[in-house]
Amino acid sequence: MDFAIPTEIQNYLAELDAFIAREIVPLESEHRQYFDHRREHARTNWDDDGKPRREWEDLLAEMRRRADRAGHLRFALPRELGGRDGSNLAMAIIREHLAHKGLGLHNDLQNESSIVGNFPQVHLMHRFGTPAQKARFLDAMITGEEAVAFGLTEPDHGSDATWLETTAVRDGS
């Protein structure tokens, strides 16, 4: 088995690095308080039940806009959603590459934001959503205008998805 990183993925990593240097590092430098020892306080509105501060959310939105405009945010999504049909292998390598760069606006795993979006909920909506749901939510989920949550925990297994006992049966279309 060949464990070498495919050339096209290596080239894409170089493209990402150039984008980060050109677009993200300057933006992050203007907002250091969100990435150093002050980050929890800077990101959190303690007077509003600990919700994220609007300024932090706005910075994440700007990062997503820039990444989307450059063609990175939707990398793993199907072409019909503006993506590049990125593979699981490519995503694993990209995520590892970005994480290795450390804490930053390019990839903040604390709140699952990244210049290369990880969108399992978008894939699910694209595959199983009704036309009305897709029209309302798909693009908004990608851009961060809408958030989606799902329940994973069960009484006997917590959040270990490998032990889920809940099942579903398709009933209708």
Describe the role of every protein-language-model region.
Residues 1-112, 132-143:
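Amphipathic, small/basic residue-rich leader segments at the start of a protein or domain
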Residues 48, 122-123, 153:
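Short alpha-helix boundary/capping motifs
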